[in-house]
Regions:
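Active-site mouth of glycoside hydrolases
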Residues: 1-118
Length: 118
């Protein structure tokens, strides 16, 4: 792999267009753990809401991935790929924030995640 020149990087950036979007979490989830864990992952809700985002002119969505999701590595990656496929279908460029664990000091991967952040 070669390093791009400043001109190559600038050219690539100019081809991307203006990014318009938001932080994304489906309405059926309380946090990023619920978005991707097995019991609460809902691709139908995700698809509907990504379609709505595209419909109002968004072209990017930022998604946070909690480090606890890697406990279900293989299954998590399947669900994550489903999410990426959905983004691709609607021409949404996801911005992925890796290993975000700052939302709650004692996170768990169970269905009792509905803690209020204090």
């Amino acid at each position: 792999m070669s390093v791009w020149t400043s001109d190559q990087a600038f050219s690539w950036y100019n081809e991307q267009g203006w990014l318009v979007g938001c932080n994304f979490l489906p309405s059926s989830c309380i946090n990023q753990i619920e978005m991707f864990q097995e019991d609460t992952f809902n691709i139908e809700d995700i698809t509907k809401e990504i379609s709505l985002a595209k419909g109002i002119g968004f072209n990017t969505l930022r998604v946070y991935l909690h480090d606890l999701l890697w406990k279900e590595k293989d299954q998590f990656l399947i669900r994550f790929n489903d999410f990426l496929d959905c983004c691709k279908r609607f021409e949404i460029k996801p911005i992925i924030v890796l290993f975000d664990d700052c939302h709650y000091p004692f996170p768990e991967t169970d269905n009792d995640n509905h803690q209020i952040i204090q």
